[in-house]
Structure formats: structure tokens, C-alpha cells
């Protein structure tokens, strides 16, 4: 327990052991990451069509191999692009394009707290909750995992209560830190 407290001061007393992942990392600025990824892809010949919506994936009737994608551009023009492969990254909406995929929405709610700088130095994963420290003391708390909610928008009292309970279960002192933002 003593070694655990040295790694995570203030950890709730019920935790007697933990796993340390020395190489665990995080990205604080996802926008910079995505810009760098886009730049690398473009340098390899990838074309991005921003604001375009894929309408259909057409497959060969016999082999079921992908033949083309049909999309509507941001300007409303319908285009057909022959291809043998496509990256499907539409998340919970993927089933609209490939109905046989067993994909469904799972709602996640999160919040952030403003803690003292360096109050938490490591990511903490607990049952149903995790705490991610940022350099400025901000702590990202996540996330609920709510099946059966469909694509419902908004925060729920139950989801927010679950996050608060997770904070108390992992790092009780964080329960007194002011909330900064809540999202789903």
C-alpha cells in the first residue's frame, strides 16, 4: 500500500494494489494530432473530402468485394468513386452502411475537474471510471457506458452521479475540486 500511495497520493484506502504501466501515454491536444495525421496521409496520396457524406458502399453481387463508394459532397453533388478498400470510421452509425455489422451506440458521459497542478501524476483506471491528469491540473473523468440509450443527446443525472461515485471510489480528495466542464 505504501508504494501505491507514493505513486498516487490520496488514492482511496480500499485499494491495496495496482498495476503500473510505465509507458502509458496520452494526447492532450487531439487537434494537433489529427492535423499531423492528416498531413501524413496527404503526403501519401490520401484525399480528404470534408463535409462529404457517404451514401452507399457498393459490392459485387457474387464475390461481395467492394466496388465503389457513393457520396454526397458538401455542395450537394453526388459522386461515385471506384475502390477495392475503404476505411469505415463512422462509429455507431456504421450499421447504416453495412447493416450486417453488430454495431450499436453506447453513450458515454464525462466531466473535468480543476485540481491543483501535479495533484495527480498518473492515469488511474478503476471499475467503471478513469481519471486522466493534464499538466495544468485539469482532471478528465470518464466515462459512463450506457447501452440502450440510442443516440440520445444530453447529460443525465444518473450518468453524472455514476462519475461522482467513481471519483469518490478512486481519489476522494478530487470530489472537492470544482467541475469545469461536462459532456457526452
For the regions a protein language model found, what residue spans apply to each?
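Conserved beta-strand-loop-beta-strand element in the redox core of flavoprotein oxidoreductases
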Residues: 55-81
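A generic structural signal for well-ordered coil/turn residues at beta-strand boundaries
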Residues: 15, 65, 77, 106-107, ...
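Central helical "cap/lid" subdomain
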Residues: 76-125, 153-159, 173-175
Amino acid at each position: 500500500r505504501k508504494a501505491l500511495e507514493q505513486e498516487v497520493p490520496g488514492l482511496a484506502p480500499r485499494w491495496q494494489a495496482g498495476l503500473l504501466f510505465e509507458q502509458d501515454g496520452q494526447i492532450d491536444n487531439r487537434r494537433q494530432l489529427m492535423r499531423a495525421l492528416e498531413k501524413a496521409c496527404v503526403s501519401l496520396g490520401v484525399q480528404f473530402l470534408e463535409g462529404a457524406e457517404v451514401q452507399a458502399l457498393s459490392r459485387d453481387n457474387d464475390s461481395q468485394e467492394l466496388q465503389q463508394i457513393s457520396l454526397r459532397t458538401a455542395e450537394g453533388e453526388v459522386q461515385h468513386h471506384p475502390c477495392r478498400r475503404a476505411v469505415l470510421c463512422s462509429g455507431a452509425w456504421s450499421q447504416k452502411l453495412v447493416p450486417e455489422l453488430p454495431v450499436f451506440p453506447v453513450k458515454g458521459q464525462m466531466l473535468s475537474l480543476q485540481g491543483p497542478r501535479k495533484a495527480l501524476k498518473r492515469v488511474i483506471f478503476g471499475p467503471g471510471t478513469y481519471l486522466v491528469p493534464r499538466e495544468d491540473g485539469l482532471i478528465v473523468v470518464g466515462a459512463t457506458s450506457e447501452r440502450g440509450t440510442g443516440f440520445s443527446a444530453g447529460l443525465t443525472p444518473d450518468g453524472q452521479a455514476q462519475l461522482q461515485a467513481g471519483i469518490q471510489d478512486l481519489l476522494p480528495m478530487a470530489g472537492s475540486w470544482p467541475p469545469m466542464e461536462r459532456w457526452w
